[in-house]
Amino acid sequence: MLSIKDIDTFLNTFPIQKDEIVPFAAKAGGGWLDPDTAVEFCKGCGISLSETDGYLHLKTSTNSIEDTVFCFVDIETNGSNPKNSQTIEIGAVKYKNGVFTESFERLIKSDHLPANISEITGITMADLKNGEKEKDALAAFREFLQDGLFCAHSVDFDFSFLSHRMEYNGLFPLLNKI
């Protein structure tokens, strides 16, 4: 699994030649792909890319602030370790050019909810009983997020936890700029 530092280090090397994205895509779980497929894989994982004369550029570093989509995310989990805990709620709003444009909210089915988590979040087992499967909620969240700039109060935790849970559920990790 790529760490936030690995992703950030890579994203700070842009612009890069198109073929330089192949090793990163392989490490992120896409396998060894041709450059065009590696670009599409990374775009699908949330990296906002544009291409000029064989060089890849991050749109998030060239877009004006008015053209940037900020996605403010908050998650709730039933524990702090994504290896043995899961996401139980995802909430997010998109903000662009001074306007909130979309929102996203999912409760996620779980058989485990410690009393202290219920007390902190206000979420009950009854709420989670009819929740979505975690994989489905995470896939829907990725589609909502697209290549938006991932923002959160506890960004390292939220981003890492969601990315790990995506991989655990057979999805590719998040690679969005944070």
Predicted features, each with a name:
Residues 57-59, 68-176:
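Conserved non-catalytic scaffold segment of RNase H-like nuclease domains
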Residues 1-68:
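N-terminal accessory regions of nucleic-acid-interacting proteins
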Residues 24, 177-178:
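A generic structural signal for ordered secondary structure
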